[in-house]
Amino acid sequence: MRATLRERELNEPLPIYAPRRQPLPNTRIYAQHLLEESRRLILGQAGLTLVLINDDQLRRQLTSSLAAEFGRRVVHESTAPESNGVVTCNWDWWLEHQEQLPAPAQLIVGMLPIASLDNPLTSARVERMKQQGEDWFRTLLLPEALSLIPTAIAPLRRSGGRLAILDGRLRGRSWGDQVLNRLEPWIPLQRLLPE
């Protein structure tokens, strides 16, 4: 008997759960939406789950709420999760530590990695572009976010996991199509089925 082991092809379609009509991250109902959807995604999936959110306050609030329900399975920015654990982290932490973690069964994108204007460096760069009359979002913030996506999802492609995007801007903004194009090839998941 002969067996050939190889890594999954990186060009196989990635299953993506991204419902239409999700709230935007700056709305009052978004935190509750994020908690409810994350809970559903975690309950229906065996294996490691990562939740990516750059907003510190929202991420810590979600971590606390998920830990209240799922206990010690939920950790914040830890490289030693349980096999069916949940790691909440920001995008930079995930990109820096993904080699130290097992391949995830799913990635939950709470918020797309668009830099916040609360960051002084980002704010200064945007202000300079505004003064020059440039489209600072499409010239600076969107390309930076799009450049992070392939590296962030590569382990998921190799493991055959699924991607869930809970940021309403994906379907609610015209530039959301650019994000979906960056994720190609992918197939839509209309429903969440337990693993």
Language-model-detected regions and their locations in the chain:
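Post-DEXD/H (motif II) to motif III coupling segment of the RecA-like Helicase ATP-binding lobe
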Residues: 1-6, 180
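Short, acidic/turn-prone active-site loops that include or flank metal/cofactor-
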Residues: 4-8, 78-80, 91-92, 111-115, ...
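Gly/Ser/Thr-rich loops at beta-strand to alpha-helix junctions
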Residues: 7-8, 54-59, 169-172
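Conserved interdomain hinge at the start of the Helicase C-terminal
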Residues: 15-58
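Conserved RecA-like P-loop NTPase helicase motor core
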Residues: 22-24, 83, 87-172
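Conserved helicase motor "Helicase C" RecA-like lobe of SF1/SF2 P-loop NTPases
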Residues: 50-78
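Phosphate- and divalent-cation-binding pockets in alpha/beta enzyme and binding domains
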Residues: 58-62, 96, 174-175
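C-terminal/domain-terminus segments
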Residues: 158-194
